[in-house]
A protein has these predicted regions:
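Active-site mouth loops of central-metabolism enzymes
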Residues: 36-49, 70-72, 98-111, 130, ...
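A short helix->loop->beta-strand "cap" motif at the edges of active sites that frequently abuts
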Residues: 19, 63, 150-151
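Histidine/acidic residue-rich metal-binding segments in metalloenzymes
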Residues: 112-231
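Histidine-rich, glycine-flanked metal-binding segment
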Residues: 1-31
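Metal-associated gating/positioning segment near the N- to mid-region
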Residues: 27-89
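Alpha-helix-loop-beta-strand connector modules within alpha/beta enzyme cores
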Residues: 30, 79-100, 144-155
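Divalent metal-coordination and catalytic microenvironments
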Residues: 1, 26, 37, 58, ...
Length: 231
């Protein structure tokens, strides 16, 4: 629905008989929620989810806009796939869908995609999704291109050698459950590296998620000097 007016004294005597009063006492009202990291199964993994089921699930939770990750089959790394995504999103979805493209070809962390061309087709940002750019030289090139083109880059902060075979954060719970833990440092080293690069290369940068209290401390301190987002 749409908010037409706000008032303190709304009752059946001062509204149209066609209107319905819903008691929201003790409730919260929000604008449509934006989910910035959504993995949709289309194309390639439609048995998991497609644009129609995604939009229905999102709407049931108050989400009206999603940013989709490029980890599909094929990977979203060229303009022909972007055109397909936009058509499918328009035809099948009831919500706003904004696709991202991969930072690197086939999300292999080596060769950059064509930022300028992909942006011209409606891509709003670049990320390798659940993969992290491990090579600092590659990340430097990515940031420089993002700066030149005013592109948004989104990083999954995780040193994937340190986190290899990990299931959950390392700690008491992982020990009790007998699961391989992911050490906190796996997240910290990527955040520190990228934010150090960001001090010298002023581009639009977003940390896709954080899972560590120490990461929060680092982010709070670095935000005093440089602009970036996280969450």
């Amino acid at each position: 629905g749409r908010v037409e007016a706000i008032g303190k004294k709304v009752n059946k005597n001062n509204i149209s008989s066609r209107e319905k009063i819903i008691d929201l006492n003790g409730k919260y009202i929000f604008p449509g929620i934006v989910d910035m990291k959504v993995f949709v199964g289309e194309p390639g993994y439609e048995y998991k989810e497609n644009f129609k089921t995604l939009s229905n699930a999102a709407l049931s939770g108050g989400v009206t806009t999603v940013i989709t990750m490029p980890n599909t089959d094929p990977i979203i790394d060229n303009v022909s796939i972007v055109d397909f995504l936009k058509r499918r999103g328009r035809d099948k979805s009831k919500i706003n869908i904004y696709p991202t493209a991969s930072l690197t070809k086939n999300t292999e962390g080596t060769n950059m995609t064509e930022f300028g061309l992909l942006q011209s087709k409606g891509i709003i940002g670049f990320t390798d999704g659940y993969k992290t750019i491990q090579n600092t030289r590659v990340m430097t090139r990515i940031m420089n291109s993002a700066k030149d083109l005013n592109s948004l880059i989104m990083q999954h902060a995780e040193d994937q050698e340190l986190s290899k075979n990990g299931m959950i954060n390392d700690g008491i719970i992982s020990t009790k459950l007998g699961l391989q833990g992911i050490p906190e440092i796996a997240e910290l080293v990527i955040i520190e590296r990228d934010l150090t690069l960001l001090e010298n290369i002023n581009c639009r940068y977003h940390i896709s998620q954080i899972s560590s209290g120490k990461s929060v401390e680092i982010i709070k301190k670095r935000k005093e000097k440089i602009n970036f987002s996280c969450g």
